[in-house]
């Protein structure tokens, strides 16, 4: 008996592949990073089998490349992610996110009294690594939160 090894998610000719996203996080990344605000084809694989992770999510975006800042902002959600740059169906670049000093225009402050909810300002958080956590400090209300609190918001 032979087993055919098939791609579970179709290959792309040119663009970005975000691999090794923890299961159940793929849709959150699409929404937070506004990755769907494009006319390019996006392919999503959810709960795919992974030798390393058990299950994983995967996002492929054709003709779109993430900036270094965008890649680093993934570190909060998918620290083990791999971001592959594809050209002519080949991986031409590979990077992993590293925790940035700031995250702008992505998150929402969990403090309901924060001015960022009432004024037309872009969100901005300073990122600080702690022993077993990552702290995010809002630029406007100056309150500090565990990254899990901000991500759940």
UniProtKB/Swiss-Prot annotation:
List keywords of the entry alphabetically: Metal-binding, Pyrimidine biosynthesis, Zinc
Q: How is the cofactor bound?
A: Binds 1 zinc ion per subunit.
Please explain the role this protein plays, according to its UniProt record: Involved in allosteric regulation of aspartate carbamoyltransferase.
Which protein are we looking at? Aspartate carbamoyltransferase regulatory chain
Could you tell me which HAMAP family the record lists for this protein? Asp_carb_tr_reg
Q: Which gene encodes it?
A: pyrI
Biological-process GO terms, alphabetical: 'de novo' pyrimidine nucleobase biosynthetic process; pyrimidine nucleotide biosynthetic process
Instruction: Respond yes or no to whether keyword Metal-binding is given for this record.
Output: yes
The cellular component terms of Gene Ontology attached to this UniProt record, alphabetical and capped at eight, are: aspartate carbamoyltransferase complex; cytoplasm
Which Gene Ontology terms cover its molecular function? zinc ion binding
Organism in which the protein naturally occurs: Escherichia coli (strain K12)
Question: What family is it from?
Answer: Belongs to the PyrI family.
User: Which prosthetic group or cofactor does it need?
Assistant: Zn(2+)
Q: Where does Zn(2+) bind?
A: 109, 114, 138, 141
What does the annotation say about its assembly with partners?
A: Heterododecamer (2C3:3R2) of six catalytic PyrB chains organized as two trimers (C3), and six regulatory PyrI chains organized as three dimers (R2).
């Amino acid at each position: 008996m032979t087993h055919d090894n098939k791609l579970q998610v179709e290959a792309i000719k040119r663009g970005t592949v975000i691999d090794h996203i923890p299961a159940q996080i793929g849709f959150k990344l699409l929404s937070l990073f506004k990755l769907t605000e494009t006319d390019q084809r996006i392919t999503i694989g959810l709960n795919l089998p992974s030798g390393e992770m058990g299950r994983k999510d995967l996002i492929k975006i054709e003709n779109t490349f993430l900036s270094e800042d965008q890649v680093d902002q993934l570190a909060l959600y998918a620290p083990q992610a791999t971001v592959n740059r594809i050209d002519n169906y080949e991986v031409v670049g590979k990077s992993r996110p590293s925790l940035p000093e700031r995250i702008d225009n992505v998150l929402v402050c969990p403090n309901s009294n924060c001015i960022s909810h009432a004024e037309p300002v872009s969100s901005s958080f300073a990122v600080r690594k702690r022993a077993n956590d990552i702290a995010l400090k809002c630029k406007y209300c100056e309150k500090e939160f565990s990254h899990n609190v901000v991500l759940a918001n």
